[in-house]
């Protein structure tokens, strides 16, 4: 019962990780297309904040596990355990992407190798998100064992990632024609609304011998409304200036990132609050 916030370390880890993966894809493409070496270096420097966010996410995951030693022990079953695969995928993404950033920021990365390394890092980010999804594809948890889980995790990456990238590129004073990225995020919001509606209907059909799924979160509907409102307001801070053919302001983009992040944190809390088993036991 509740809002699922009792799993706040996992809420932060998954949302932050997906945001970083999405932002790296956008910022990486801008870096690859940029011909000005000075602008490229400003992009690289601004990427520091991505890895800072990723570091916060990993610290939250360690709090969930209890100690760093448990995180290392969980790697013992890579290939056989979805949790081990998630930690391994996240660690590799963090290490490969972080090392690319470190070598690039000190100016020691060869140009050709740097491009390949960055693309590999972007792909590893997608693999990391997919590994997260596999952790929650549990047959005995019918509220999670659906395509909505896959959609929701990737939607977070598409909703929050490009907006975070737009903010960091603005801070770096790099020209970013963000109409396409903003359109993709707006489309993701529409899909997100559809997922909420369809999943709400599905919850009414899921039950165990002692519990119905739609009774797990009595405030599910109202919290989802707040979540969608926050997402719409956050994206509006980015999209409205573009509609007026103006460059979004740094403060507006920062507010947008904060609103979208809050909305996705609420949504992920609801996800964990929907945990129920197919047997007699109910968790959450």
Regions found by a protein language model. Give the residues of each.
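N-terminal signal-anchor module of multipass membrane proteins
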Residues: 1-56, 273-274
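Membrane-interface interhelical loops and short amphipathic "cap" helices
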Residues: 1-10, 62-84, 133-150, 199-223, ...
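Interfacial loop-to-helix junctions that mark the boundaries of transmembrane helices
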Residues: 41-42, 79-84, 114
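Alpha-helical membrane-inserting segments
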Residues: 29, 56-59, 164, 168
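Long, contiguous internal "core" modules enriched in hydrophobic/ aromatic residues
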Residues: 14-18, 36, 89-91, 99-266
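Long, hydrophobic/aromatic-enriched structural stretches that serve as scaffold segments
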Residues: 49-108, 122-125
């Amino acid at each position: 019962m509740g809002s699922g916030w009792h799993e706040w370390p996992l809420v932060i880890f998954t949302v932050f990780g997906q945001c970083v993966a999405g932002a790296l894809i956008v910022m990486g493409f801008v870096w690859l297309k940029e011909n000005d070496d000075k602008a490229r270096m400003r992009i690289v420097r601004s990427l520091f904040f991505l890895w800072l966010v990723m570091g916060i996410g990993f610290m939250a995951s360690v709090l969930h596990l209890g100690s760093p030693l448990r995180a290392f022990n969980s790697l013992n079953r890579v290939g056989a355990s979805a949790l081990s695969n998630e930690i391994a995928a996240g660690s590799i993404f963090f290490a490969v992407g972080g090392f690319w950033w470190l070598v690039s920021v000190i100016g020691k990365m060869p140009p050709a190798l740097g491009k390949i390394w960055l693309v590999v890092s972007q792909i590893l980010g997608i693999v990391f998100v997919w590994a997260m999804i596999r952790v929650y594809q549990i047959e005995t948890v019918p509220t999670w064992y659906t395509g909505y889980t896959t959609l929701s995790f990737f939607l977070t990456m598409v909703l929050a990632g490009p907006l975070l990238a737009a903010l960091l590129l603005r801070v770096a004073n790099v020209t970013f024609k963000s109409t396409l990225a903003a359109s993709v995020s707006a489309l993701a919001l529409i899909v997100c609304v559809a997922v909420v509606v369809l999943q709400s209907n599905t919850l009414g059909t899921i039950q165990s011998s002692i519990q119905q799924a739609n009774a797990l979160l009595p405030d599910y509907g109202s919290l989802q409304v707040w979540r969608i409102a926050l997402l719409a307001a956050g994206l509006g801070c980015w999209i409205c200036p573009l509609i007026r053919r103006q460059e979004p302001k740094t403060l507006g983009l920062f507010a947008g990132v904060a609103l979208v992040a809050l909305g996705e944190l609420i949504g992920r809390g609801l996800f964990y609050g929907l945990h129920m088993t197919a047997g007699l036991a109910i968790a959450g």
